[in-house]
Structure formats: C-alpha cells, structure tokens
C-alpha cells in the first residue's frame, strides 16, 4: 500500500532478495526491482503464497521481442493470475479446462500494465496472507528519526520492536535460503507438478492448490486434553481396571495405556510409548497421549486366546453402531458408540474348536478346563487352621459339566488337595477369606508356571458378607424361579428346584457366587443343566486322593509333569476329543459297582473278540470320521456363541451319525450282545428328526462361507419365523432401491444430453459412479458431487444416487441385524434340544472309550480280569503281572511278577531289597493293575483275580513341603496319619520306606507300629517297603502268616585287584546285578555303595564309606553278641522269663 502523503513510501524488502539468482531455461532471472513494476506489485510478490511463488519461479521464461528484456508482461500476467485464483475460490466447480483457457488468454495479452488503482483488488486478495506473515516482517527501511509504527500507525515501544526483530530472525533462519519456500510448500504432500511445459504436454491444466494450512493442535495432543474416543475408553476402563481391553477403532483393534504394555509383551507386537497410567499421574505429565498397540481385525480371535492363555482377563470393546446408521442418526458428529461386549478368562473362554487345549497339549501342560469356586469356614470346636468345612462348585463351561461337594478337612488339607488334583482347575474363584493352610496350598498348586495343573492358574477373589448364607439361598432361589416361569414341564422343573434347594449351605454359597460371576461372561445359563450336576463324593466310584494320582502317575508323569509316560497316555487310543475327556474321567473314578463294572468289561471283551468284524470296523470308521468336537460345539450352541460354519458342521456330523444306524429301532437290533454297546448305538438314530428339521432351513454353501445374508434357504417350508420374514422384507426393500438406481441411469443420461442410459462404475469400493469425460464437464450440473477423476474424465454421484445409496445402506444394516437375530433364534431353538443331543454325544464318547480299551486288550500279554463277588474276602492274586506304563517305555520290556494278597493271610507284603532293585516299581505295578481292572480294562498280566477295592492309598517318595513349612518327615507321618484314619479292610495301602526322614531307631519304631496297626486293627491289604532289617525279622512275630517277607532278587560279584586277588578291603569293587524278580525271604543288605558307585561318586570317598560301613556292622554285631550272651546266662541260671527266652531266640536269629 502507498504511504501517506508527504511521507516516504513504506518499502518492504522482497523475499527474492534472499535467494541466489538462478538460471531457468538458459536465462538469468534479474534480482533487482523490475522497471515499470509498482511497489504494490513487489509487495504482492513477497506476500503471495509459497506455492504460487514457486510456480512463478519455475515457469519457463519467454522473451518478448517487442518488450526486450523487460519483465512487465510477466508482471501483468502474475497480477491477472492472482485475480483468476480469487475467482476460482468463489467458483468451486470450475474445471481444469476453464483454468487452462484463462491462462491462455493471459499469455495472449501481455501488454496491460498494472496501475496503482488496478492493484486495489490484488492488494485486497493478498491481505489475508499479508496479515498472516506480517508478524514475521521486520522493516529496516524506516527513516532514521521517525518513530516506527504498526499497521494502524501507532508507535511501537522497545519491547515490541525487540520481539519483532526476534521473529524476523527466526523467519530468515527458517526461510532465508534457496528453495526454502519450495520445500515448505511441498512437505507431506509430495511435489505438485505445475510447470507450463507439463501443462502443454498433457493437454490438461493442473489445478493450483493453495498451501496446506498450518496444522493446529489436535485434541489430546500437546494441549494435554484427551480426544473424545480416549475419554470414551477411559470411562469404560475405570469400570474394569482388572481387564485388558481390546478396543475396536475403525479397521483395527487397539490397546491403550498399561494394556498396550501387556499386549506388547504377551503378543510380541510394537507398543508405541506414551502414558501407561489411567489416573493422570504427575510422573507422566510430560506425555501427551496414551501408549498404544494395535492388531488387525481378523487376528482378534488369535490374540485374544493368547492373552487368555497367559492368565489375563480380556474384554472386547466394540463399535455398536455402523457408519450408515450413524450418518442417519442424531449423533453424526460424536464418536462411535462403543460398549464392552465380551469378557473372557481361562475358565470362561469358549473357543471354537478347542484351540486352547491344542496349545496347552503341545507343551504337555493340560488343565481340566474347570472354573472352581471354593469357600471354607472354621469347623465347630476346632482351633485356628485346624478342621474346616469346605464347599466347592466346579464348572466346565466348554462341556457343561458341573461338580459340587461339601466336606470337612483336617490340618493337612488332604481332601482339598485331592479334589484340586482331580478337577485340575484352570481358574479359581475364592469366596471370602481362606485359612493360612488352605491359602498356602492354593498358592503352591497354582502359583508356578509348571504346577501340577499343567499351567498357571488364574485366581480371583470375592468378598463374603455377614449375611451371605441367607443372601446366597435367596439369590439361587430367585435365579431358578425365573427359569421355571417359562418352563412347560412342571414336574421336571419342580424336581430341578428341589435338587438345587437341598444342596448343602457351603455349596449354595459357591453356587450363588458362580451365578454372579458367570453372568458377566454371559454363561450363567449353564446352571440350567441340572441333569449334569454331579457330586464329587459318591459311593459308586473309588476315591483316589491327590497323593495317589501323583504317585501312580495317572494323568501325568512325575518327571516333567507331561502326559507322556502317564497311565492316561498308555491307554489313550480314543479317536475323538470328547472320548478322550471321558477316558480321563473313567481313570480318575474307578467303579465300585460290580454290575456296572461287569457290563463294561463284557463290552470290551465283545469288541475285542470281534475287532476284525464288519460291525466293529463300521463303528471305528464312524468315530474316526468325526473331526468336530461335538461336546464343545453343543455347549457353544447352548450359549449362543456358535458360528454358522460350525453349526453346519455339527448338524451334518450328527445327521451322518444318526443315518448310519437309522435301521436300529431297539437295542436288540444292533447286532451286539453287550447291553452297554447296544443301548449306546440305539440312542443315536433318535436325534435324526431334530437335526434334519434344522438342516432343511440352512443353505449349506452360504453357511460354509459364513454368509449371513444367504444363510437361510428361501424355499424353506418354515415361513412362520418372524426373523426370517424380516430378512425377506429387507431383501425386497434393497431390491426395490437397486431397481430405482437402475432406472435413474436414464435420468442421468438426459441431464448429460445423451440418448443412451449411462453405465455405473465401481472404483475403489465406491459404487454407482457416473463417468463424464472432461471435454463434457460443462454439462454436469453443480448439484452433482465429484467423487474422483483422472486427467481425461471425472466421476460423479447425483443427488438422487446419494439418497438411494444412503437408503440402501440403511436397509443393509437392518438386514444384517435381522440375519443375526434369526440366527440367534435358531441357536436358542436348538438349545432347547440340548439334552437329547448331548446324550447322543455321550453315547459316542462311551463307545469311543470302549473301543480304546478293546484296542489295549489286543496288545500282547493282556488278559481279562476276574472280579470276585463282594462276599469274597479281600483278595488280589496276580500271575505274570507287568507295569502298564513301564513296558511301553522300557526298550527291553518289563520282568513279570507274581504275588498274592488275601484275607486272612497274607494281608501284607514286607518288601526288602537293594537300592534300585525295583521295589517301588513292583508295588506301583500292583496298584495300577487294580486300578485298570476297576475301570473296565484288560490288564497286562497272565491272570488277575481280585475283589473290588474301595480306595488306593499311597505314601511314597521323600520330599519336604516348603509352602506349608513342613519337613520331609512331617510330610511322611502326616500322609500316613491320613491313611490310618480313612483306610478300611477293603482298601489297598502302599507304604514306601516309612521312617526314613528321622533317626534309625525312631524311624524303625514308627514303621513297626504302623505295620502292626494296619495288619492287626485295620486288616487292609498292604505293601510295605523298608530297608530296616530288624523290621523284617519282627514282622514274622505279628501273626501266623499275616505278613509275608519278600525281596527283589539280585546277584553280586567282586572285581579282582591289579594283583589278581579278590578285593577284601572294601565293598567298592562289588558288582550287583538286578534281576527285578519277586522272591520270598529278606534281603539282608541294601547295597547303597553300589548305587553310589553307579552315580559316579569318587572312588576315594567310596573306599572311606566302605570301611566305615564295615566297622559299623562289626560294632552292631558285637553289641548283639554281648546282649545275647547275657540273656543266655540268665536263662541258664533259671532267672529268665518266657519273654527273655523269646528275645534270646530272636537275637540268635539276627546274628
């Protein structure tokens, strides 16, 4: 602008003065002010946008022959271009051809000079950019002595001048070098091709875009404020602080804060640093956003499983509104509505095909999949941490099994340990406070990553109020009363409620807590299945305690706690997952009912004898063809979490099973003699009508592709379903909209002046685009919205197309909701038929286990056990018995043994022998043969005759119990005391080296007393291993034939010295050969030095040990000889009593 009259004109240095003159197309651009160019023109040049200036600098220089080397024509053109830009801003629909035409007119008329009056519009158009850059301008051209003024003419003080100088210095530093403006204008956007040469070559004029506006501060960025989405997340997170939240954000799922750190560690994904806390802690005040991590949408199931398997509680927050419905709603400017839709933990994750079992099984760690609720109260009249009353409820959501129990436990907490080891929970829910002893037990069993459950167990706690028993009973009653309102079977419903209300108080307390807990996960409906409530303590099954499970290696070996090398591993020949689970239950619960056991053994025998027959082969082929875990899939249908492909697979598999035996109407028509097999096969065809009725409504091709829109068959006979009617309605609405879109093609063609209807195209997922060549762009109405384009054509949506697409999208969203609702209704309908379908699957599992036992029976050396009647005295008679696990793992096979235990004699075997001679293996093999016989399997023996044992108790191994602060000897006597309290005359007891944890005299005395008690008082069948020679001799006096001394046979030989003489100085050179055979008599030595030599103890140490051992033996023999001499003298004098005479005879035998 011109300065005031009478004053020197205000002059601003051009930015071009900062740049080095550059040669463009062979001509050097002048750096001084151009002749004939006004000051306003120079100011405009300085204040114009970077992109415009860059375009001017890069435009080719064309020399005008009339104007010489002057630049007036270019100045005129630049002025005119600025005006054209203003016009373009006012008319957004001007196309590239119009811009090119205006540029061409400017080139054809270069003469007019821009006068002062003509620059008014130019100055006005550049006022915005001038005001934006004005605060960076520092004018050094002000005359001395004249006060410097601002834009309004007011004088500036020193502070303002200093500030303007600093801003000027920053401006020069940032932009005062060649190509600075060019780089600034093109940053982040890529270089814009706006040169005149490219315009002429392409034939199209590129639109000149204004420079991108400076990016303002985002919400939640450096201002420290959270974005609306982050506030939304924080609101949900504060209600679920114990949950790792996975939030749906667009096409990804994201983690925020501490959840992102956890996800980065567990999932091995990148965690972008930021705030980890959710409480605005001062230590994170310098951070402006949450830490975050993200995963693709399609990987959600995989990563969710990994987090759950790692022991985390995982929640999925989903967007519960779609873009189409949001656009049509009132909250279009608000963030998507998000809600916590799913919550998972180890015990409540219902995976599709048992993937979590596959993950844990691969590492050898396998839990039972149970969620176990535990509570306890102090028993009346007992001290702190002594006896407690315990209640538990265990639920296996993947199969629908429910176990409950209420019992009293002692200070050793052996009963709780037994149930925990049997159930193997993957998650514990503890109600109230536990006693110190129970707390330590739970911590020990669940705390480590390689615990006896197989993997780390998640523990959650629930507070217990003062009036909890009454509240729990009321809560359970209301829960089941609500279920009974809609029930049509009154008798069944009444029986259901009566069964639940008669549960013990501790069990009711746990049941109430479990209902509340599972409601969060949407799994509370599992308690509707009261048919599958089972009491842990029942007289129809043998109770195997936790110590016995570990000692006999029933479920996993004792070395690395994997399944390989266990009894389950040796017997598992099942073909289905649900069959394998039933086999596991059978091994942990041997039968006590002789009639049921005889039926099972007879079924195994028939399948074994006809193993090559067509009927057995047909059954084997059917089971081998089942690839779906039907038990898990049925419970997922019951919960309403089954997918469409999975539902189709389940129904088709059940149909194939039912059709296979469609001709069977009665058990007698199966062709098998066994009642167990016949009844199981006869139950399979009964589900055919149920399955077929649902398959007739399903389109199999769409179900396999998980196509919700075509899942239901259009020609289905069932047309009364409201959900399917709604699907039809929405499909018709969509078809009507698409028909209108097709008819609109003619209207669009008429608008463009075409006779033929236009064709729609789809580009980058955008449908119903109308393509118009840029040469016909003038025919396009202003109301048409340009979506995209190329150099030769543009693509538009007409207002009618936009309206119809929005209407169609709304119908599509409604159709998707109708399809989901109809599918959920179908799942609910199938859930009403859960029990007959589950019974059919149970029959298949039974057949699978029986076939597995038949396959085991076909192994060499297996025979059918003979079960003696209950009236027969307790007896176990084995001929040629072998260890069922060791013979699979030992390359040289297992040496058979033969023995007999019976009442009245011999009730017990006192087993002696050298270390590593096979004593423990012998007693374990005998116990495993009994267990196998009572689960209905053939046994690895020439023959086995036995009565049913009500329990198997073991006290084996030597280890301390640090978690309970118990020494090795304390563990020994504690377990022994539990056996003495609970053993009955029909129990089998195994005691291995009792008393080794203390001194020789005390240990021998305790072992003697315990052996005397189990033989004289309890009178149970017992195998007693010992190294005490005195105990072997004393056992002979316990009664005529009550205790039989047996030992493990071996041979010994000595090595020659270097001189060729026998080594007489020590026992180091003595070689022991183990024969692993059971023989009568006592082994007088344990040959511990031989084991030490095998363990490679240094020879010098062995030589010293041998001398000490020989000296101690001589001292003991000397003392015994002196004692016997005194007794003999007393007897000779006639002073001795009958007891002394008996003692003398015993001493002589010991010598």
Curated annotation (Swiss-Prot):
Keyword list, A-Z: ATP-binding, DNA damage, DNA repair, DNA-binding, Nucleotide-binding, Nucleus
Region annotation (Mispair-binding domain) ranges: 223-347
Bias type Acidic residues, positions: 84-110, 196-210
Binding-site list for ATP: 913-920
UniProt superkingdom: Eukaryota
Family annotation (SMART domains): MUTSac, MUTSd
NCBIfam families linked: PRK05399.1
Protein name as catalogued: DNA mismatch repair protein MSH3
Organism: Pyricularia oryzae (strain 70-15 / ATCC MYA-4617 / FGSC 8958) (Rice blast fungus)
Annotated gene: MSH3
């Amino acid at each position: 602008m011109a300065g005031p009259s009478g004053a020197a004109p205000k002059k601003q240095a051009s930015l071009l003065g900062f740049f080095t003159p550059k040669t463009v197309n062979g001509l050097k651009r002048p750096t001084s002010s151009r002749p004939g160019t006004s000051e306003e023109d120079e100011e405009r040049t300085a204040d114009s946008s970077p992109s415009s200036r860059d375009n001017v600098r890069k435009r080719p220089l064309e020399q005008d022959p009339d104007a010489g080397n002057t630049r007036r024509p270019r100045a005129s053109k630049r002025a005119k271009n600025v005006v054209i830009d203003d016009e373009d801003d006012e008319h957004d629909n001007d196309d590239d051809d119009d811009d090119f035409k205006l540029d061409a007119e400017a080139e054809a008329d270069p003469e007019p000079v821009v006068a002062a009056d003509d620059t008014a519009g130019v100055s006005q158009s550049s006022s915005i950019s001038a005001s934006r850059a004005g605060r960076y301008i520092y004018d050094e051209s002000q005359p001395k002595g004249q006060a410097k003024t601002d834009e309004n003419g007011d004088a500036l003080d020193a502070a303002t001048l200093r500030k303007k100088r600093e801003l000027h210095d920053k401006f020069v530093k940032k932009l005062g070098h060649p190509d600075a403006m060019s780089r600034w204008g093109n940053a982040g956007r890529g270089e814009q091709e706006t040169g005149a040469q490219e315009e002429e070559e392409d034939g199209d004029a590129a639109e000149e875009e204004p420079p991108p506006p400076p990016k303002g501060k985002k919400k939640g960025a450096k201002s420290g404020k959270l974005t609306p989405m982050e506030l939304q997340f924080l609101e949900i997170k504060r209600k679920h602080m114990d949950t790792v939240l996975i939030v749906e954000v667009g096409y990804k799922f994201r983690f925020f804060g501490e959840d992102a750190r956890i996800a980065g560690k567990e999932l091995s994904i990148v965690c972008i640093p930021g705030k980890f806390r959710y409480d605005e802690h001062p230590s994170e005040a310098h951070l402006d956003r949450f830490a975050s991590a993200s995963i693709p949408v399609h990987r959600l199931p995989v990563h969710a499983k990994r987090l759950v398997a790692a022991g985390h509680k995982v929640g999925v927050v989903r967007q519960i509104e779609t873009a189409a419905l949001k656009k049509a709603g009132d909250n279009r400017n608000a963030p998507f509505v998000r809600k916590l839709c799913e919550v998972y933990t180890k015990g409540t994750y219902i995976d599709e095909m048992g993937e979590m079992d596959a993950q844990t099984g691969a590492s050898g760690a396998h839990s039972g999949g149970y969620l176990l609720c535990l509570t306890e109260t102090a028993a009346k009249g007992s001290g702190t941490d002594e006896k407690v009353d315990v209640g538990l409820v265990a639920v296996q959501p993947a199969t629908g099994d429910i176990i409950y129990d209420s019992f009293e436990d002692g200070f050793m907490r052996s009963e709780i340990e037994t149930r925990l080891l049997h159930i193997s929970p993957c998650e514990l829910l503890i109600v109230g406070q536990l006693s110190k002893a129970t707390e330590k037990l739970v911590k020990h069993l669940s705390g480590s990553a390689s615990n006896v459950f197989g993997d780390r167990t998640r523990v959650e706690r629930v507070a217990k109020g003062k009036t909890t028993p009454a509240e729990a009973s009321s809560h359970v009653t209301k829960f089941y009363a609500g279920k009974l309102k809609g029930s049509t079977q009154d008798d069944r419903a009444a029986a259901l409620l009566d069964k639940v209300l008669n549960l013990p108080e501790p069990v009711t307390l746990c049941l109430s807590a479990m209902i509340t807990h599972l409601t969060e996960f949407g799994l509370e409906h599992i308690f509707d299945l009261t048919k599958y409530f089972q009491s842990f303590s029942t007289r129809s099954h043998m109770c195997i305690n936790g110590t016995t499970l570990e000692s006999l290696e029933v479920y996993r070996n004792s070395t690395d706690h994997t399944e390989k090398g266990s009894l389950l591993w040796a017997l598992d020949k099942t073909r289905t997952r649900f069959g394998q689970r039933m086999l596991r239950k059978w091994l942990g619960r041997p039968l006590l009912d002789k009639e049921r056991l005889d039926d099972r053994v007879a079924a195994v025998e028939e399948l074994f004898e006809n193993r090559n027959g067509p009927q057995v082969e047909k059954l084997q082929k059917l089971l081998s063809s089942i690839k779906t875990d039907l038990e898990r899939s049925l419970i997922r249908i019951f919960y309403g979490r089954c997918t469409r492909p999975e539902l189709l697979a389940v129904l088709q598999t059940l149909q194939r099973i039912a059709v296979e035996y469609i001709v069977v109407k009665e058990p007698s028509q199966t062709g098998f003699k066994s009642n167990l097999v016949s009844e199981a096969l006869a139950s399979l065809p009964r589900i055919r009508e149920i399955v077929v009725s649902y398959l007739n409504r399903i389109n199999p091709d769409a179900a396999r592709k998980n196509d919700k829109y075509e899942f239901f068959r259009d020609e289905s006979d069932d047309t009364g379903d409201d959900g399917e009617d709604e699907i039809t309605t929405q499909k018709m609405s969509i078809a009507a909209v698409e028909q209108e879109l097709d008819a609109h093609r003619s209207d669009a063609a008429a608008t463009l002046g075409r006779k033929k209807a236009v064709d729609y195209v789809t580009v980058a997922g955008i449908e119903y685009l109308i393509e118009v060549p840029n040469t016909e762009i003038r025919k396009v109405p202003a109301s048409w919205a340009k979506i995209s384009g190329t150099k030769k054509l543009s693509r538009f949506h007409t207002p009618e197309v936009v309206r119809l697409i929005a209407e169609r999208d709304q119908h599509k969203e409604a159709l998707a909701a109708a399809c989901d609702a109809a599918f959920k209704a179908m799942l609910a309908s199938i859930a009403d038929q859960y029990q007959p379908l589950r019974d059919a699957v149970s029959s298949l599992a039974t057949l699978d286990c029986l076939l597995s036992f038949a396959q085991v029976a076909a192994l060499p050396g297996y025979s059918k056990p003979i079960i003696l009647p209950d009236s027969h005295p307790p007896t176990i008679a084995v001929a040629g018995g072998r260890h069922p696990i060791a013979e699979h793992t030992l390359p040289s096979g297992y040496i058979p043994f033969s023995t007999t235990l019976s009442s009245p004699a011999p009730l017990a075997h006192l087993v002696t022998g050298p270390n590593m001679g096979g004593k423990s293996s012998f007693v374990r093999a005998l116990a495993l043969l009994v267990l196998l016989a009572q689960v209905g399997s053939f046994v690895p023996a020439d023959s086995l005759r036995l009565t049913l044992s009500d329990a198997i108790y073991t006290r084996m191994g030597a280890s301390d119990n640090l978690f309970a602060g118990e020494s090795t000897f304390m563990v020994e006597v504690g377990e022994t005391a539990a056996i003495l309290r609970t053993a009955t005359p029909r129990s089998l007891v195994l005691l291995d080296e009792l008393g080794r944890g203390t001194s020789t005299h005390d240990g021998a005395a305790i072992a003697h007393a315990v052996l005397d008690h189990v033989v004289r008082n309890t009178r149970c069948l017992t195998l007693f291993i010992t190294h005490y020679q005195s105990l072997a001799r004393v056992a002979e006096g316990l009664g005529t034939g009550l205790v039989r001394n047996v030992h493990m046979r071996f041979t010994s030989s000595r090595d020659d010295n270097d001189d060729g003489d026998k080594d007489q100085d020590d026992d180091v050179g003595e070689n022991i050969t183990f024969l692993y055979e059971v023989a009568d008599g006592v082994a007088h030595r344990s040959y511990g030095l031989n084991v030490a030599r095998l363990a490679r103890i240094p020879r010098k140490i062995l030589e010293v040990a041998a001398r000490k051992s020989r000296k101690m033996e001589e001292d003991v023999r000397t003392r015994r000889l002196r004692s016997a001499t005194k007794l003999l003298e007393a007897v000779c004098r006639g002073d001795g009593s009958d007891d002394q005479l008996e003692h003398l005879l015993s001493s002589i035998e010991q010598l």
